[in-house]
């Protein structure tokens, strides 16, 4: 090590300085997370027009490699603003771009071995691709288009099934997608399908509390006597009489908190104490506790899916592949540096070139940061007609009007930070 430091301390030529400059610029340029910090401040302050202006500016000055993230964030801002149709247009564009990016570019992969993962076009984590359809389903449900919403729900479930069975990934289906499927099917009076979706959501997240009400009611209605008896014994406090002819339901979906953010951490890849940096998800605070009031009913929203937990699971499945790529990258850079040293007949220059090349070997910390940490749900049985829903979270209170017809299920989607 002392010998190496002496080599590095010697004066170098302009070529080395030029190489250093290029590598440093490559490592630092185009940090999407940093460039959109102001956008996130506006978004979390519910200044949605300001967030959209900021995203447009980032899009104009930014790189194509961040194009998917711009679309995802824009679609989510429009969704939070209640611009359901506009959000779906952007999300559809994001879905199409994501599909195109899934075709791996050989030149891009090779380039990442010399520079770093941040120089590739962002393709999205597996769960982020699934969330495109979840957001679209909620948009369609708010627009009253149950069939289009169910298409998106089925797409989530089918994609997850493919990931598990064909790609051998240790994922589970998303409870929020199955629960939303139950809500939509119940609204369509497809009782058996609604029961199946509610039952699957309960299997994935057994801590649903009062949200098991439709599962109790529909298990009895569809003649699943053994299931009904077991549920009734477990939840004796949950009333579940049949719906009256003039009765309706309101389901409130609260997208709560901030999705976790990627941060670098070091992993040991061998017995020599050598460390490689990889990304891990770190929480950005806790999701707020949410209370929902409708008339004289007051419910605490129940967490159906922790997206923070899903994100960590999905990223953890990629760590092995990341380490392998990093090792391959180190090997390629060592070869390039050795070649440079041989060509210039300077061992010192080769060593410095390797250090400079490897200094840019940073993990990709980009992610879809406008997503929530959790999906929380509250539901109510109410007379048909117009109702005001009051949502309280983190000291912020908002009111939302929903009009629901007899026998139907009204949906209210709210974003809270």
Language model regions located:
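Short loop/turn and low-complexity linker motifs enriched in small/turn-promoting residues
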Residues: 225-417
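Bacterial Sec signal peptide processing site at the extreme N-terminus
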Residues: 24-48, 57-61
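Boundary/linker segments of alpha-helical solenoid repeat arrays
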Residues: 63-67, 98-109, 161-170, 202-230
């Amino acid at each position: 090590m002392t010998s190496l430091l002496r080599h590095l301390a010697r004066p170098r030529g302009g070529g080395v300085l030029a190489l250093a400059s290029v590598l440093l610029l490559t490592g630092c340029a185009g940090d999407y997370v940093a460039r959109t910090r102001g956008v996130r401040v506006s978004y979390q302050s519910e200044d949605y027009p300001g967030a959209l202006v900021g995203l447009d500016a980032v899009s104009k000055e930014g790189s194509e490699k961040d194009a998917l993230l711009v679309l995802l964030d824009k679609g989510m801002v429009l969704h939070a603003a209640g611009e359901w149709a506009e959000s779906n247009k952007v999300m559809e564009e994001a879905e199409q771009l994501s599909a195109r990016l899934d075709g791996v570019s050989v030149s891009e992969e090779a380039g990442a071995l010399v520079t770093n993962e941040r120089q590739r076009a962002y393709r999205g984590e597996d769960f982020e691709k699934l969330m495109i359809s979840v957001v679209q389903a909620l948009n369609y449900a708010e627009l009253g288009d149950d069939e289009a919403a169910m298409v998106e729900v089925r797409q989530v479930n089918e994609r997850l099934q493919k990931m598990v069975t064909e790609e051998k990934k240790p994922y589970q289906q998303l409870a929020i997608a199955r629960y939303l499927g139950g809500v939509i099917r119940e609204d369509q009076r497809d009782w058996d399908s609604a029961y199946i979706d509610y039952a699957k959501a309960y299997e994935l997240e057994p801590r649903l509390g009062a949200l098991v009400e439709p599962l109790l009611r529909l298990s009895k209605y569809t003649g699943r006597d053994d299931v009904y008896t077991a549920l009734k014994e477990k939840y004796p406090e949950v009333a579940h009489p049949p719906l009256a002819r003039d009765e309706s339901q309101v389901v409130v979906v609260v997208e709560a908190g901030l999705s976790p953010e990627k941060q670098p951490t070091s992993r040991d890849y061998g017995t020599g104490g050598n460390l490689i940096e990889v990304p891990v998800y770190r929480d950005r605070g806790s999701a707020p506790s949410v209370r929902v009031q409708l008339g004289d009913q007051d419910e605490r929203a129940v967490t159906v899916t922790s997206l923070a937990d899903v994100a960590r699971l999905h990223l953890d499945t990629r760590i092995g592949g990341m380490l392998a790529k990093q090792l391959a990258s180190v090997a390629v850079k060592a070869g390039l540096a050795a070649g440079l040293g041989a060509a210039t007949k300077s061992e010192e220059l080769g060593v410095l070139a390797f250090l400079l090349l490897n200094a840019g070997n940073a993990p990709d910390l980009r992610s879809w940061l406008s997503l929530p940490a959790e999906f929380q749900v509250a539901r109510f049985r109410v007379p048909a007609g117009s109702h005001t829903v009051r949502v309280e979270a983190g000291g912020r209170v908002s009111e939302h009007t929903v009009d629901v017809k007899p026998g139907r299920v009204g949906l209210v989607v709210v974003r809270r930070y």
